[in-house]
Amino acid sequence: MIVKTKKILIDSKLECSSGEALESFELMTDFYGELNEKKDNAVLVCHAFSGSHHAAGKRGDSVGWWDEFIGPDKTIDTNRFFVASVNNLGSCFGSSGPLSEDKNGEKFNNDFPQLEIIDWVESQKMLADKLGIEKWHLVIGGSLGGMQSLQWAVSYPKMVKKVGILAAAAKTSSQNIALNEVEREVIKKDGDFHDGKYLEFNKSPVKGLKAARMLGHITYLSAKNMDQRFGRKLQSTDSKIAEDVNFEIENYLQYKGGKFAELFDANSYILLTKVMDKFDIAQGYEDNLEAVLENVSAEMLVVSFTSDWMFPASNGKEICLASIKANKKCSYIELEGEYGHDSFLYPNEGYQNALKNFIESK
């Protein structure tokens, strides 16, 4: 598989929904496969909340977050398709964000423009223009990436042939907004946060970020999977992360939260949770989802998982039902999924076959 990683400069102004603007910006992007002469085999893969451009392939000890799905003869066959995977603006894996420098050569910190999903789509559209891609064969993503896919179908109906919306929703629920607010507050209460200017003090609020991620990670799992995997098993003494840990599930969350805090940026975390909170595709349409979808021309596939309590199956059904009422072509698949919200990330023969058939159908 041909893999290229590039940091691409978009030397044009991005007017953000907040009223702020970026005069130029960079998008860290992975490319898999080759773009054909007609440039009609392009696929855009949108990552979830804390994901990155590294969707496939192995780099050192790191394997792409959708490696089982992208590659030669895989679900998204790179013998046929050219895949672009973009690190979202505001994230911390190479694209412009709080860790980047502003026009004065200073780190943005928490002064990076507040973004919305529609801004991400606009930045990706500018990338497509630069690549000479007039129409994506497919835009696909899970969770926050699925929301981007839906926004693409609405914002640029003539630029998308197919859309895959996985474990996502048309708007963020009040429950998710509440959880995100708690996570933000935990980060801000860390003594090393310094009102978001921690880099100026050579600090990082790792304790707060760790705790926030531990809370967030619980929402990605399912009660059934947690019971099957951990139950009430006690953690062995020789592998305890902390002295006061008793159960395996505690140790697991301590480990996951700690590793995450080593890799992620707290200001990005806060910014991205707000991006999620602000998403409501029917805002400005009197909450009429059917009306929003009137101009969509892409064929849609919506996949939900019954074990997902972050974006439950009812969210996916809502999107597909509104699409059908708007006389759009939409298929809906509901799977149990072993891993709760994260089920969209894991290989499953029936799930992958459904995606592959959708992607390759004419």
Give the location of each predicted region.
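Cap/lid segment of the alpha/beta-hydrolase catalytic domain
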Residues: 63, 74-128, 177, 181-199
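Conserved hydrolase catalytic core segment
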Residues: 135-175
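Catalytic-loop region of hydrolases
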Residues: 1-45, 59
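N-terminal cap/lid subdomain of alpha/beta-hydrolase-fold enzymes
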Residues: 30, 34-102
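Alpha/beta-hydrolase-fold enzymes
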Residues: 165-259
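Catalytic active-site module of serine/aspartate enzymes centered on a nucleophile-bearing elbow/loop
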Residues: 318, 324-362
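Conserved alpha/beta-hydrolase "acid-adjacent" motif
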Residues: 309-315
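Short beta-strand/loop motif that positions the catalytic acidic residue
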Residues: 296, 302-304
